[in-house]
């Protein structure tokens, strides 16, 4: 404002933001010099700039835009929000200073971790580098406010990011440099203009200081929670009374049309059997691994690998489903166990050596690869000698005679102490689709066959068409992400407002928060095999695990907070709504179960009418986990979060439509958007199919919401549990995981029963006090 900008307080904070920049640059330079010289750390400063900006039409715009984004967004997220929350929470419990101190430390750790993707050694160098600056910036914020930290951050980044612009001597370079300087001086220019307009420096009015704000008197709610039942219309009444019949029809349709069988056979061997088969395969190669080697195994699916999935989709569409099913297990990979052998101790160079063995359902070796350190000495074979070795490997590993095959490519890679070769052979005898070709790849490291595999060559025109389609659909996928982000933000805002206005069930919030947090931590621990497969042997194991653990805890806290807020708000809305105990001769819960069965059956029927764009693959939701049966239990308990989210959606839609009396189109739009987003999240490998299933689910769920659930949100857990159990049965049948399915289903139903009974109890104190107000 004009009064604020013309004050010495704002001018001083603006100048202070600029003056801190050289101090910060000096601190960074000193840190790099000291750690690189005396500690042997590696932190390349060139990664702080990007010379590629010079290839853009206006090179100055990129550093300006990125710096502004970082200054405003990061200072708000990493300084203003956590430090303010620390002060508020600390004051709430009588320890304001302690709350602020803890927030200062936490924001510094998170800020450093959020920037740890920069290259550097050791892996924790970047968080250590940013810890002290983050502390300093937090103290600046606490003393002077957000203005100097935003200016400091934005100008600091602009100085680094614009370095390439000032290293160029070309036509137009001075214009770009002038734009950068002008952008950096805009805050000072604003101060100067306001000072000139005011004619003199003016004291900052007390009304413009942060301390002048006072919370206003709490306004009464314009529309309290409904205490009388909604009038059931003719259409709703007919639908509700027809639900038992519709539910039976849904079950019949589900049995008749649901894809209980995948197009490829599921894995039936467990992790121990796969590791034993891989050990035997290495022993057959004459390899004896010492005690320093660690073994990890997880299920590998083609549908999880974009490159492999492109081969599978190409054969499915171009050669046909029958040909596809015949090729799965030969040229095309079936579901396999991938066993990894790696070392995390000893010499860092030698730790680059790894073995990976893919084991199929019959305990046969699908593929075996041996990654060698680049400097490992070996033979220098000629092309002919290496080719002879590769042809022999085709016979021994795949039982394929190499004589009829066509040599497509032969590449040589010269290593420091050996020569590596890679060969690709084409097999035109196997039909994989017009223009495609079945191929074999063999890698020779020195005189050792270090890898061999099979794949499908896909024509460039087909790949380009798929890429263009994916690019167009990427907008839809991003829209799905935006929907989830908006939903999470809505949960946070509505939950906080509900807390402030006493429109939240604190008991439900606490229970769901605790359960979800513990569940998330246990799920991360149970997912250890998958995490271990991604660990790098060239980085310290302790630092990697520390980052994984801290990231898991942070994610668990955020997820638990959102789930708890959804539960508190959703349970409040449900428990302050009139109860619908019976529909005709049936209990209302039975009608909710029938509605869920009807939805699943209708989805299965309509989905069966569409031509599949890709093969159906069995999932591996439990088998890859460390303890599959424990994973089934955790999956069932996780239903509490889904039920809370759906209760929250019903509550929010009810508020936006004034108790489902106005703007019903908005209710349909919200449900459609959420169903589309959920389908895209679950079906990333088949976006068109996900859009179809999401549209069907959205339309049907909207109908059930308007015709049944709006009259009593307490029916949501039973309705949602039915859909989850029946949908999970399809995936479990495809994966031949009936025992985990049974455990998951039992726990899910138990959670749904508990949640329904919880919602039917007398409202909590918070809810009761609201109704009395």
Predicted regions and their residues:
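Alpha-helical transmembrane signal-anchor/signal-peptide segments
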Residues: 259-279
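Core alpha-helical transmembrane segments of integral membrane proteins
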Residues: 1-55, 59-62, 74, 80, ...
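Membrane-interfacial loop-to-transmembrane alpha-helix junctions, especially the N-terminal start
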Residues: 14, 96-101, 146-149, 204-209, ...
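Membrane-interfacial, low-structure loops and terminal tails that flank and connect transmembrane helices
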Residues: 1-17, 91, 198-238, 570-590, ...
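Long, charged/polar, surface-exposed segments that mediate recognition or autoinhibition
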Residues: 272, 282, 286-288, 340-347, ...
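Exposed beta-strand-loop-beta-strand "reactive/processing" segments of non-cytosolic proteins
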Residues: 254-257, 284-361, 405-446
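Transmembrane helix-loop-helix hairpins at the membrane interface
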Residues: 56-205, 622-763
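Short, aromatic-rich amphipathic segments at membrane interfaces
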Residues: 448-479
């Amino acid at each position: 404002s004009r009064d604020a900008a013309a004050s010495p307080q704002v001018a001083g904070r603006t100048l202070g933001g600029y003056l801190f920049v050289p101090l910060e640059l000096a601190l960074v330079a000193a840190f790099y010099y000291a750690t690189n010289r005396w500690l042997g750390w590696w932190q390349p400063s060139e990664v702080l700039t990007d010379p590629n900006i010079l290839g853009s039409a206006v090179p100055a715009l990129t550093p300006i835009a990125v710096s502004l984004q970082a200054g405003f967004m990061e200072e708000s997220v990493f300084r203003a929000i956590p430090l303010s929350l620390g002060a508020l929470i600390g004051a709430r419990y009588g320890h304001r200073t302690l709350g602020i101190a803890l927030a200062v430390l936490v924001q510094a750790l998170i800020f450093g971790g959020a920037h740890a993707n920069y290259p550097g050694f050791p892996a924790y160098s970047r968080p250590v580098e940013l810890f002290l600056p983050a502390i300093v910036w937090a103290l600046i914020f606490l003393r002077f406010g957000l203005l100097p930290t935003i200016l400091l951050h934005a100008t600091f980044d602009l100085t680094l990011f614009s370095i390439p612009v000032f290293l160029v001597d070309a036509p137009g370079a001075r214009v770009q440099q002038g734009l950068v300087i002008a952008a950096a001086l805009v805050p000072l220019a604003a101060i100067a203009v306001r000072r000139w307009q005011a004619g003199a420096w003016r004291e900052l009015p007390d009304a413009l200081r942060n301390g002048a704000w006072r919370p206003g008197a709490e306004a009464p709610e314009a529309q309290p929670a409904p205490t009388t039942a909604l009038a059931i219309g003719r259409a709703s009444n007919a639908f509700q009374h027809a639900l038992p019949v519709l539910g039976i029809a849904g079950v019949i349709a589900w049995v008749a049309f649901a894809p209980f069988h995948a197009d490829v056979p599921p894995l039936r061997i467990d992790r121990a059997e796969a590791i034993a088969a891989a050990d035997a395969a290495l022993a057959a190669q004459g390899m004896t691994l010492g005690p320093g080697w660690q073994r990890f195994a997880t299920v590998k699916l083609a549908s999880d690998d974009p490159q492999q999935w492109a081969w599978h989709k190409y054969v499915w569409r171009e050669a046909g489903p029958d040909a596809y099913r015949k090729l799965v297990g030969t040229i095309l990979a079936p579901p396999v166990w991938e066993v990894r052998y790696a070392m995390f101790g000893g010499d860092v160079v030698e730790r680059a050596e790894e073995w990976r063995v893919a084991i199929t359902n019959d305990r046969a070796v699908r593929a075996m690869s041996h990654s060698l350190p680049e400097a490992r000495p070996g033979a220098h074979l000629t092309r002919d000698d290496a080719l002879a070795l590769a042809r022999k490997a085709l016979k021994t590993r795949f039982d394929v005679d190499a004589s009829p095959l066509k040599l497509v490519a032969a590449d040589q890679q010269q290593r420091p102490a050996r020569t590596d070769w890679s060969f690709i052979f084409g097999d035109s005898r196997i039909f994989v689709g017009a223009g495609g070709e079945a191929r074999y790849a063999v890698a020779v490291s020195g005189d050792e066959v270090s890898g061999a595999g099979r794949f499908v060559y896909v024509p460039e025109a087909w790949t380009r068409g798929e890429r263009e389609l994916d690019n167009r659909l990427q907008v839809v996928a991003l829209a799905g992400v935006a929907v989830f982000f908006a939903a999470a933000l809505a949960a946070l805002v509505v939950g906080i407002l509900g807390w402030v206005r006493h429109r939240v069930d604190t008991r439900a919030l606490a229970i769901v928060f605790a359960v979800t947090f513990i569940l998330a931590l246990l799920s991360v621990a149970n997912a250890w095999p998958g995490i271990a497969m991604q660990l790098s042997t060239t980085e310290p194991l302790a630092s990697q695990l520390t980052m994984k653990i801290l990231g898991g805890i942070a994610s668990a806290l955020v997820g638990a907070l959102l789930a708890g807020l959804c539960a508190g708000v959703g349970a409040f809305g449900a428990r302050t709504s009139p109860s619908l105990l019976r529909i005709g001769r049936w209990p209302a819960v039975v009608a909710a179960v029938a509605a869920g069965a009807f939805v699943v059956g209708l989805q299965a029927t309509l989905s069966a009418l569409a031509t599949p764009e890709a093969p159906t693959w069995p999932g591996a939701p439990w088998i890859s986990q460390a303890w599959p049966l424990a994973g089934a239990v955790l999956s069932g308990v996780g239903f509490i979060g889904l039920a809370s989210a759906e209760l929250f959606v019903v509550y929010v839609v009810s508020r936006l439509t004034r108790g489902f009396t106005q703007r019903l189109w908005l209710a349909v739009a919200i449900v459609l958007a959420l169903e589309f987003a959920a389908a895209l999240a679950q079906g990333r490998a088949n976006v068109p199919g996900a859009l179809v299933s999401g549209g069907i689910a959205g339309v049907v769920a909207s109908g059930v919401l308007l015709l049944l659930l709006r009259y009593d949100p307490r029916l949501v857990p039973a309705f949602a549990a039915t859909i989850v159990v029946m949908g999970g049965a399809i995936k479990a049948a495809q994966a031949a995981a009936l025992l985990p399915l049974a455990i998951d289903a039992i726990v899910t139903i138990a959670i749904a029963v508990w949640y329904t009974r919880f919602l039917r109890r007398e409202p909590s104190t918070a809810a009761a006090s609201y109704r009395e107000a």
